[in-house]
């Protein structure tokens, strides 16, 4: 899937290993953009699965316009403590609302180090795969605008936060690049044996979206293999 043609000034992207940011990467490449993927390592329980997904996805994508992955550490164990994102206990299951997966201050934590890195390396654009309907206050236009202004004041440089999917649903973005190796992505709060658990909030969201794709959902879920213990 190598990209051809010229590329423009570099745009960084927060790449999580999930569906949304993978599609955003493909979308940027379609526009002839040279992309700098950035992964924020937070030590949440899904980190190893995300890192593996990103490595495999980028290898298969094989785009000359994608720069080597930058990984920045923002460990959260001291902040989140016994939260389910650290322990894996009482993970929000498929019956819960989007609000149940709140991670306190997630976007500020993900953005601050990535934006500083961009500023230090002369990159003026950072793209996020935030979708329409995100219920959290740190995904609002006001937050992104004010956060970017604060960083600009602190560093005397401008890093613009791009959110090209902000007015789109997951079903709509899936239609943009259904040819991507999306089976390699991971969208799970509690991976089991390298597979999606199949019973968490994010697995339910993933399954609902992918089953509408041609060929259906290719994901192998651990609960279908009897690999999920009773922690939910």
Protein language model regions, located:
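Serine/threonine-rich low-complexity intrinsically disordered regions
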Residues: 62-64, 75, 200, 217, ...
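Short, intrinsically disordered, charge-biased short linear motifs at domain edges
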Residues: 174-177, 182-192
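Local cysteine-cluster metal-coordination motifs and their immediate loop/turn environment
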Residues: 108, 112, 186-208
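A polyampholytic, Gly/Pro-enriched intrinsically disordered region
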Residues: 93-95, 180-186, 205-212
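Short Fe-S-cluster ligation motifs
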Residues: 204-210, 215-232
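Charge-dense, low-complexity polyampholytic segments
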Residues: 126, 190-195, 215-223
């Amino acid at each position: 899937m190598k990209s051809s043609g010229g590329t423009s000034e570099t745009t960084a992207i927060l790449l999580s290993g999930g569906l949304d940011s993978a599609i955003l990467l493909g979308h940027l490449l379609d526009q002839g953009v040279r992309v700098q993927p950035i992964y924020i390592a937070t030590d949440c329980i899904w980190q190893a699965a995300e890192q593996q997904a990103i490595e495999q996805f980028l290898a298969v994508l094989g785009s000359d316009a994608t720069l080597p992955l930058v990984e920045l550490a923002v460990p959260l164990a001291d902040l989140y403590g016994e939260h389910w994102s650290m322990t894996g206990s009482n993970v929000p299951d498929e019956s819960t609302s989007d609000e149940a997966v709140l991670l306190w201050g997630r976007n500020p934590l993900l953005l601050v180090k990535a934006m500083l890195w961009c500023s230090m390396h002369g990159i003026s654009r950072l793209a996020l795969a935030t979708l329409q309907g995100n219920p959290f206050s740190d995904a609002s236009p006001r937050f992104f605008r004010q956060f970017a202004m604060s960083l600009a004041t602190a560093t005397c440089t401008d890093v613009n936060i791009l959110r090209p999917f902000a007015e789109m649903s997951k079903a709509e973005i899936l239609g943009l690049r259904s040819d991507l190796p999306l089976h390699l992505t991971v969208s799970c709060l509690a991976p089991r044996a390298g597979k999606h658990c199949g019973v968490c909030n994010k697995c339910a969201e993933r399954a609902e979206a992918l089953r509408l794709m041609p060929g259906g959902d290719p994901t192998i879920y651990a609960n279908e293999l009897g690999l999920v213990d009773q922690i939910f």
